[in-house]
């Protein structure tokens, strides 16, 4: 299987009529210096002025938010699932330090951002959803992580 061909085809998903407005909104986001607090809530903070009402508008365009919670400069995104509870339950049982970590079905990347607390060598997420990728891109625009998000499904893993 040619994964590059699959990636190119999946990139076209970003032009779908329900996704294109999200991608346009993401392209308009300002570059600001921000800090990330990785706790139960993946929280972003900045000394710079942030247009929180514009962030809320964009976040609402991206609903539903399944995994989280997130706090974007004071805008709390209360997600459908309390992913922090599951993560906190499992975290004592793994060591990610220096390891390559894959998140299969990564959704918006909540767990991948939490993984950063443990300094893994590399984090790669797999999820074939243009909406979830857009949510991830919103958060990562400010986190500025090296996380790799692949618009690939479980069926592509043997070829990765």
Describe every region a protein language model picked out.
Residues 121-156:
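Class I SAM-dependent methyltransferase SAM/SAH-binding core
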Residues 1-61:
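N-terminal auxiliary segments of SAM/dcSAM-dependent transferases
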Residues 70-84:
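Class I SAM-dependent methyltransferase Rossmann-like catalytic core
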